[in-house]
Amino acid sequence: MKPQWQQYIQIINQVVKPALGCTEPIAAAYAAAVARTLLNDDPDSIAVQVSDNLYKNSMGVYVPGTGKIGLAIAAAAGALAGNADAGLEVLASVTPEQVAQAQALIDAAKVKVERTETDEFIYCCVTLTSGEQEAMVKICGGHTLIAEKRLNGELVFTADNAQAKATGSICDGVDINIESIYRFAEEVPFEEIQFILKASELNSKLSDEGMSKPYGLEVGRTMKNGIAAGIIGEDLLNKIVMLTAAASDARMGGANLPAMSNLGSGNQGIAATIPVVITAQCYKVSEEKLARALIMSHLGAIYIKSHYPPLSAFCGNTVTSAAASMAMVYLAGGSFEQSCFAIQNVISDSSGMVCDGAKASCAMKVSTSSSAAVRSFLMALSSQNVSGQGIIANHVEKTIKNIGKMVLNGMSSTDVTIINIMSE
């Protein structure tokens, strides 16, 4: 196998992985669980310091297994009940009794959460104290990327800068672009990428959960009711939007099921997966072709998002759905050129969507971007594409660079304004 392809598989394995609950509060739970292994005792108090973006994405989302919202319960549950070896599934085994213990710590004002100034978009520092003992774990650059551990002020671990790599820079130094991703997905031996089918399994289970139970805003179930009432039809567009939104409903509503995440985001893992799975069912393709399309979608999303910070004022579901749309064209038998058209079309359609934190209404944004993916894939199959208009360049690679410029240079103040509004 080509060394370049081995790099691609390594990237996918690094950032396409199961995550139980929204990854921002889960980062605090994970840091707390790791700190607890240093302390070797239950904490008397917990202090949590986070970046503005991590704070923003933790304010309105349920923490799985707890039925509660926010960083305080995430950190307390992680410290008292978290499995430090489980990564983003750190809270998979939390019990109601342990949640009650965590809430008691919060009620006793023993859990403190505050924002801190930092250049890192993903930053979380958790300090646990028990009597005279103190343990600290610092996460930087990625939701489970530990930068430092201290016990009673003594440094016990620091990340090797040569090995530690922030998720946003994961494609640095890698020979990768949209065409190389497309060719890789087309040609790599099936057995090397068969693992990606786990994304279909996990995210489809979340979709089923969101359709069967009342989570969040019930975006998916509301569409189901509309179909049953004869108001809308159960065509490909509505089925994709309904089932993708339902998975997000369940995730944002605290369902105790993992999502296969993409670059630290469960919702974006859902957006990269469910539209592709439903399209594969529509065209009755083989399991192998579905796997190739999922690789195209997930790696395409990773590549596009590597052009800007992992947390920002820009809703990443837009470009994730662009990658999904590219894969949908592939499933329908379209050309590489038409797959590029699909990316251009989605970005033109919904690139103005902002991120104002993780919460129930994210399911609406997921449904919006998934809808754009379907429209754009249909247009692309007819060779209709946006080109040389606004931020959309004449070539897909230039468009992707433009998105990076827009987020990096144009949306920093937007992000600050959004966070300030949310904190009022």
UniProtKB/Swiss-Prot annotation:
GO terms for biological process: L-cysteine catabolic process to pyruvate. GO terms for molecular function: L-cysteine desulfhydrase activity. InterPro entries: Ser_deHydtase-like_asu, UPF0597. Pfam families: SDH_alpha. Belongs to the UPF0597 family. This is UPF0597 protein SO_1403. It comes from Shewanella oneidensis (strain ATCC 700550 / JCM 31522 / CIP 106686 / LMG 19005 / NCIMB 14063 / MR-1).
